[in-house]
Amino acid sequence: MQNSLPIELISIVRNLEEKARSVGLDFFTTMFELVDYKQLNEIAAYGGFPTRYPHWRWGMEYERLSKSYTYGLSVIYEMVINNDPCYAYLLRANSLVAQKTVVAHVYGHSDFFKNNFWFSKTNRKMLNQMANHATIVRKIIDEVGQEEVENFIDVCLSLENLIDIQAPFKAKPKTLTQEQKEKAIHQPVTKIESKPYMDSYVNPNDFLEKQQSRIVEQAKKLQSFPEEPVQDVLKFLIEYAPMSTWQRRVLSMIRDENYYFAPQAQTKILNEGWATYWHSKMMTSIAPLDASEIIDYCDHYSGVVASQPGQINPYRLGVELLRHIEERWDKGRFGKSYVETDDPKTRRDWNTSINLGAKKLFEVRSLHNDVTFIDEFLDEDFCHKSKMFLYDYNTRTGKFVISNRDFKEIKKTILKQLTNIGQPIIKVIDGNFKNRGELLLHHFHDGDDLKYDYLLECIKNIYKIWTRPVHIETLVENVKRRIAFDGNTHTIEKI
């Protein structure tokens, strides 16, 4: 796709790139392409990439985006790909003011992709990788047939969230050989050396019993399969499920792609806040707009940060919290002295003019994801200043009403929504359950029950890959249940 920029836009891009680098942004080489709304919807339907493996979900997403644009419900102003070089798409129909804003916004994203810790393990050549995946799937379709491949991809996509988003940053566990396992299982109880007459005091029975219990527990652990609960369910299926070579390859590709997209979900608020912070700064002070453009910019900006009761706007929350951090660190509103000050007037007037705000913002950009960002910096002052509340829907009036103003509850609710990117934590507990090769999963309950219809379809699709009965333990209305699918029927039992 080659859509060269007009001379006027090239000049804008060069100017904003120079200004962005001058304030410390460090981004990949960024390539801009100009596209119409149909082309942008196609790219957006593909998850931001110009090509993907053939599947009906892309067409469905394109129809949704097209109708949303036609009815005036949404407009995509830009798309940016985490790649080196970074590719960004500009909507041809945008006004010149919008194009300037979007270009500045893109440089913020590109800087974030390059420097944020949570993106450090992503494939920086994913544009090529996606094209390779598309080629591989097309070859498999030619060999196996479209319907069979498409049906298997349907199954894989329904399970794509069963990964461990922390896995790229975890050290690989040491694996023991069978000989080492046998030695550990049959090791004798270790006694502390002592004189015979002191043995009963140095090695009392309760000490020896504890040692024996530890050995027994370790033996059980080493003999279990897997030895530790595995959150990356897809990896477990890839390694141990009885699949054909092409199926294993397709599932591996879908897993790899989901790991690529995971950091974007983990940092949505901070990433969008960072890009919005810099496009706002660029348009108003670093590379200011003309007086004739300010009204259009403000109208565009107000649309970006608009919020509604009961919903989190990541652009608004991200940029406002970053500005709050900047103000706090510029005025020295951190540390023991400030935290221990209870007087509201003293806190409000606190200003040591330390001016560490900019330095702190770059530190936040480098180290945090949404959970740590909110957990560390969302404080009571910000909550009150931003008028953040919890809302419930009133069925009688048909409106959202404030249900809770308590800061701790508000923060807890936001963090709960963000933990594990909003997905349930499910782990493989036993790959040989009942000693019959059946699969046992466990849902780590966080207060919310699993959606029952989703749960039934999930274990049904895992069965299609595992080919043996699949069980999952969870809480249903605070009662421990084990739900299973044996290839024909679902069963549920109390445990």
Where are these regions (language model features)?
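Auxiliary, metal-adjacent structural segments of Zn-dependent hydrolase domains
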Residues: 7-86, 208-241, 472-473, 478-486
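Post-HExxH zinc-binding segment in Zn-dependent metallohydrolases
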Residues: 108-179, 272-289, 302-310
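Well-ordered beta-sheet/strand-loop patches within structured domains
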Residues: 135-138, 154-243, 247-251, 315-407
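Long, internal scaffold/assembly segments composed of regular secondary structure
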Residues: 218-319, 323-324
